[in-house]
Amino acid sequence: MIKQNKKGRFDGALNSLRTLRFRDVLKWKLLHPYSPAKSHKCLVVKDEHEKLIAAQDYLCWLGHASFLFQLGGKRILIDPVFGNIPFYKRNIPAPYTPAMLPNIDFLLLSHTHYDHFDAPSLRQISKYTKQALLPLQMGCLLKRTVKSNLHCTELN
């Protein structure tokens, strides 16, 4: 269970965070050399754009942690990443561009790690939605990054 402490920060039930020193990282890199995967089998992505505008509920995986789903007539886009980001190259292109997506009722961002909070993707998608659901204290960062009039609702 994660709760907000008196200083406004979030702490997990187990205090698993610790400070890493440079020598710890160096030791890890030297003792665990990088070995790329031997083969990648890519998923086949079918273009089913017509289903994205249907009235029925659906869930569509857009790659990595990006999802678009419709529930009760509301479309919600989670952690959109449409291109390559540092240290994470897409094995297959995104199945849809932001312009291909139907109107988005809510943009939901889970946290600010670069593979979930991609500034170029957020700038693109901000043209197609006006509402963002965010963790506490993330609204200012999103508005600075996107430079649009997104209405930000911060949730605990």
PLM segments and residue spans:
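A generic "binding-loop/recognition-motif" signal
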Residues: A65, H113, M138
